[in-house]
From Swiss-Prot:
GO cellular component labels: nucleus
InterPro entries on file: MADS-box/MEF2_TF, MEF2-like_N, TF_Kbox, TF_MADSbox, TF_MADSbox_sf
Compartments, record wording: Nucleus
Gene3D superfamilies assigned to the protein according to its UniProt record, in alphabetical order: Transcription factor, MADS-box
Function: Probable transcription factor involved in flower development.
Reported tissue expression: Expressed in flowers and seeds.
SUPFAM superfamilies: SRF-like
Pfam families: K-box, SRF-TF
Annotated protein name in UniProt: Agamous-like MADS-box protein MADS1
One GO process term, biological-process aspect: regulation of transcription by RNA polymerase II
Chief site of localization: nucleus
Molecular function GO terms recorded: DNA-binding transcription factor activity, RNA polymerase II-specific; protein dimerization activity; RNA polymerase II cis-regulatory region sequence-specific DNA binding
UniProt entry keywords in alphabetical sequence: DNA-binding, Flowering, Nucleus, Transcription, Transcription regulation
Length: 225
């Protein structure tokens, strides 16, 4: 008569549960040893009892085998599912951007006083506060630009006034200089016409004319020469 099939479920009796644990643990450790020897496999086995006691077996080292396992899992996840991870990342980013765009569009409509029916009292109050702060900053910036423009125009006005005074002084100085030149005795020589000179004798041509009539002063000057 064959052995009956044992139902796999938690053993309620504490003593029976402990006895079964010891038997199966020893059998599991034996099979792990046989697997490592017969198949030249790297085997690591870790078992914790219900009381928290540790039982382990490794033909190499439990820590070394665990590190090897973690490395293999990391490499496979980095190489095997890169495209899948990238696709998932871009989908998440696209979804995030769509939400941001939708929120910005809703905020713009709220600022323009549209689609306010979807807001409650608290949200309307927050929107009002944000608008008041925004208007305050806009007015402050506008006044800042206005004061800067006024200051620039005042400086420009002073520069133009200084330039005007300088030009007036130059004109007055030129007029005084012209008046002084008109009063100088040497101005009578300006009415004497220029006469041509002989290139050899360096004398006016009319002085070389024998028919030229000299004044007494001129004759005396010629005699002295």
């Amino acid at each position: 008569m064959g052995r009956g099939k044992i139902e796999i479920k938690r053993i309620e009796n504490t003593t029976n549960r402990q006895v079964t644990f010891c038997k199966r643990r020893n059998g599991l450790l034996k099979k792990a040893y046989e697997l490592s020897v017969l198949c030249d496999a790297e085997v690591a086995l870790i078992v914790f009892s219900s009381r928290g006691r540790l039982y382990e077996y490794a033909n190499n080292s439990v820590r070394t085998t665990i590190e090897r396992y973690k490395k293999v899992c990391s490499d496979s996840s980095n190489t095997g599912s890169v495209s899948e991870a990238n696709a998932q990342f871009y989908q998440q980013e696209a979804s995030k951007l769509r939400r941001q765009i939708r929120d910005i569009q809703n905020l713009n409509r709220h600022i323009l006083g549209e689609a306010l029916s979807s807001l409650n009292f608290k949200e309307l109050k927050n929107l009002e506060t944000r608008l008041e702060k925004g208007i305050s900053r806009i007015r402050s910036k506008k006044n800042e630009l206005l004061f800067a423009e006024i200051e620039y125009m005042q400086k420009r006005e002073i520069e133009l006034q200084n330039s005007n005074l300088f030009l007036r002084a130059q004109i007055a100085e030129n007029e005084r200089a012209q008046q002084q030149m008109n009063l100088m005795p040497g101005s009578q020589y300006e009415s004497v016409p220029q006469q041509p000179y002989d290139s050899q004798n360096l004398l006016p041509v009319n002085l070389l004319d024998p028919n030229h009539h000299y004044s007494r002063h001129d004759q005396t000057a010629l005699q002295l020469v």
